[in-house]
């Protein structure tokens, strides 16, 4: 099953996540099909907290990709920010 989920990056105590489309059997930070955005939970000042390619996210959801709970909330927040 194809899923949209977060892959962790960044350094210790300073997380950074990529929104990735991947097979659900792959490791969290392993192989992915496509990166469709990023999420920086510790963004400060002028840093961008969330960036999502809405067109690609919509495409993958239409193809049957299942978002994780956190990604579903982030996609909702991104749509609200763009509206």
Curated annotation (Swiss-Prot):
> What is the designated name of this protein?
Small ribosomal subunit protein bS16
Q: Which HAMAP family match?
A: Ribosomal_bS16
Q: Provide GO CC annotations from the record.
A: cytoplasm; small ribosomal subunit
* Native source organism of the sequence: Pseudomonas aeruginosa (strain UCBPP-PA14)
Origin superkingdom: Bacteria
What GO biological process term is on the record, naming one? translation
Q: Which GO terms describe its molecular function?
A: structural constituent of ribosome
Sorted UniProt keywords: Ribonucleoprotein, Ribosomal protein
- Give the similarity note: Belongs to the bacterial ribosomal protein bS16 family.
């Amino acid at each position: 099953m194809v899923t949209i989920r977060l892959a962790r990056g960044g350094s210790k105590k300073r997380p950074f996540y990529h929104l990735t489309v991947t097979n659900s059997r792959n490791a969290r930070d392993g192989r992915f099909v496509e990166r469709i955005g990023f999420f920086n939970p510790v963004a400060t000042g002028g840093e961008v907290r969330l960036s999502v390619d809405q067109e690609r996210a919509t495409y993958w959801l239409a193809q049957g990709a299942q978002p994780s709970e956190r990604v579903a909330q982030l996609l909702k927040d991104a749509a609200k920010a763009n509206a």
